[in-house]
Every structure is written in structure tokens, then in C-alpha cells.
Amino acid sequence: MSNRTALVFGGTRGIGAACVQKLAESGYDVAYTYVTSAPNLPAKIGSSKTKGYAVDICQPAQVAQVFADVARDFGGAPHCVVANAGINVPPGPLAQFDPENFRKLVEVNIVGAFHVLSAAARNVRDGGNIIALTTSMVRVAVPGGGPYTASKAAVESLLRSMSKELAPRKVRVNGVAPGPVDTDLFRAGKNEEAVARSAAMSPFNRVGQPEEVAEVVSFLASDKASWVHGQIIQPNGGMV
């Protein structure tokens, strides 16, 4: 997989950082984005080059610019784009849900994802692939989780359309929808009892690890997944 470049949006923590590591180990040079302070990540992982860029995905000009920067710094457009950047907010029943928190979810998880996926569709190389992170919770009714899962369901709808639109260019489009994964984003606002309830949703009685999700992303980014297109893969430990 030499001389291929991946661009990971939201690549400095949790699942995103694991994706950067795994894609680099699989042979990709990896560009990644962050929001504020530059992360302390190495400039190379093994023989693969890595470089970070400050990008607010809610600003379409910044999203467009990072594709130009990656083309300049890595010798061309990316072969793979991973749309991982997003937020969560405290859950709650719809009747009492803070409208401002819902607005934030829409702004980042839907509008921001739209900017990333739209730019990816314009810039990814022919024969490349686009992967977006969503959530298995889209298919599970969980009290209090409706606003967040609605924002991720919107991303899945965009992916389904893109899979048809980009097929003439042989660009594969897929989603990865993990169940609960042990990240800072997942643990924010949860006590240990809430974490245990999430773990109990899997028959293995645990939550996933970022590296387990990154393995799926790496597979989809590889030639081994050449016949996987328009799919939502759910690494969730059997959560049904």
C-alpha cells in the first residue's frame, strides 16, 4: 500500500487516533485533523509519514483548505478519507432536551459531516474510498439517545446517496457504526453504573476498544474490501 495517503478528520483521540495508527501501520501516509491545540504525535509511524492540520469542520473553507494542503504536502489528493470528527452532548429525554445542545449536534455531526463528505467526494482520488463513523445506536431504541443518534442517522443517509453517486469513479463509500467504545467522548458525563449498563448491551458484557474499530476502518481502506461498498459495518460485540 505504498504511496497512498489517508486523511482522517478527528484523528487525535479515541477512535480517530487509533485509525491514524492502524492506517499508518498498514502502509498509508496519514494526514489528520484536530480542532485546537496541536497533538504530540510523531511525524512518522514506522515508514509512514504523518502530519496534523487544524481544521474546524463547521467551516467549509477550512475543510476545503486541508484537502489542498494535503495535496501539496503528500504529493496529491488522498486515496482514503475517514470522516470521524464529531461531538456528543449529555443525553436526555426529548421532552426536556436542551435545544441548544441539539443545535450543536446538528451543526457539528450533520452540517460539519456534510462539509467533510462533500469535499471528500470532490477531492478523493478515483478508485479511492470514503469511510464515515456513525453509531450502532441508530438501530437501537435507547431512552435519552434520540438527538445524538438522529445526527448519526443523517450521516448514514448521506453515505447511501454517495455510494451511488461516486460508483462511476470506482470510489467505495462505507460507514462504520460501532457500539459503545471506551473513549473520552463515550465516558463524558457517565458514571461507572452508566458505563456498566452500556457494557451489558453486548453479550460479552464489555465495551469496545478504539483499536477494534480501527481494524474495521483499516480493512475497508484496503484492497481486501474491494467488493464492500454502500455498507454500514457494525463492530459492536453482538449488540442487537
Regions found by a protein language model. Name each.
Residues T12-R13:
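Conserved glycine-rich cofactor-binding loop
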Residues S26-P42:
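Conserved glycine-rich Rossmann-like NAD(P)H-binding loop of the short-chain dehydrogenase/reductase
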Residues Q65, D69-R72, G92-Q96, E100-E107, ...:
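Active-site Tyr-X3-Lys motif and surrounding loop/helix of classical short-chain dehydrogenase/reductase
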Residues H79, A95-F114, I131, V155, ...:
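Catalytic Tyr-X3-Lys loop
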Residues G86-R103, G144-P147, F186-K190:
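Conserved mid-core segment of classical short-chain dehydrogenase/reductases
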Residues P91, S218, H229-V240:
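Short C-terminal tail/terminal secondary-structure segment
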Residues L117, S151:
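Active-site helix of classical SDR
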Residues R122, K164-P168, S226:
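Alpha-helical segment proximal to the catalytic Tyr-Lys
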